[in-house]
């Protein structure tokens, strides 16, 4: 048995074992016992054996995340159109992180949809390739500014959840407000940065927050706030979020929309 810390700073347990006689034991059933013994949530590696038999087998157990996310989405185009100029993605990132991104394309309809879809696809490719979040956004901005004669801007609203620590980072380029609901408290986070595709030099707003069990992070695009009376938008949306007892993320998204 070997107990070590891997390159990501997470614990690993390498265990070589076998059973007596013809008995076979599922690897998953051992994970709970080992977690109790070590005081850490250990999960078996996907690449190893799933059953322990009479032959010696080495199984790797890795420290698993302490948190998980549940997501819900609601969308509609301008004027109740079926075509929305907004695009989104949810992706697993290295190091036990989870990313959620929104992009609002310039204008509305098909053209805006194409712009925001392009931005989201580029973001997915760069993040999956291992680029840091802010570097990826800067690279997309350079692509949009230098590759076209006309200005076509899009917003980026990216939230990265660390499923091990419970911390999240909110990264915005021209994006709308984000609301964090903790029990009876609502935190309203805004951005003053420009969208991508406008200028070569891009300032990206970023802030980190510690989350706890049951916290809701509500991301939205400008169209939601624009549908509310000017001057009362933030207050009314906070009231809507705080006043509902809905707990299911998908139902909450529909309720807000």
Identify the meaning behind each predicted range:
Residues 15-23:
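A short interface-forming secondary-structure element
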Residues 50-105, 111:
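N-terminal entry segment of metal-dependent catalytic domains or homologous docking segments
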């Amino acid at each position: 048995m070997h107990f070590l810390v891997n390159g990501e700073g997470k614990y690993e347990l390498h265990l070589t074992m076998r059973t007596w006689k013809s008995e076979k034991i599922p690897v998953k059933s051992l994970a709970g016992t080992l977690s109790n013994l070590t005081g850490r949530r250990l999960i078996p590696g996907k690449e190893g054996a799933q059953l322990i038999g009479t032959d010696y087998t080495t199984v790797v157990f890795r420290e698993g995340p302490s948190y998980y996310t549940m997501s819900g989405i609601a969308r509609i185009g301008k004027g109740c159109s079926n075509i929305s100029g907004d695009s989104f993605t949810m992706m697993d990132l290295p190091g036990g992180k989870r990313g959620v991104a929104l992009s609002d394309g310039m204008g509305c309809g098909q053209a805006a949809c194409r712009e925001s879809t392009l931005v989201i696809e580029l973001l997915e490719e760069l993040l999956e390739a291992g680029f840091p979040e802010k570097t990826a956004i800067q690279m997309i901005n350079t692509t949009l500014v230098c590759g076209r004669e006309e200005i076509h801007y899009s917003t980026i609203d990216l939230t990265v959840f660390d499923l091990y620590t419970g911390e999240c980072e909110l990264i915005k380029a021209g994006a709308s407000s984000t609301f964090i609901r903790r029990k009876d408290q609502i935190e309203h986070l805004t951005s003053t940065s420009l969208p991508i595709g406008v200028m070569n030099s891009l300032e990206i707003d970023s802030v980190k927050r510690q989350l706890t069990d049951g916290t809701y992070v509500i991301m939205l695009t400008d169209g939601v706030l624009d549908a509310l009376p000017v001057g009362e938008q933030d207050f009314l949306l906070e009231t809507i979020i705080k006043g509902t007892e809905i707990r299911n993320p998908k139902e909450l998204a529909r309720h807000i929309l």
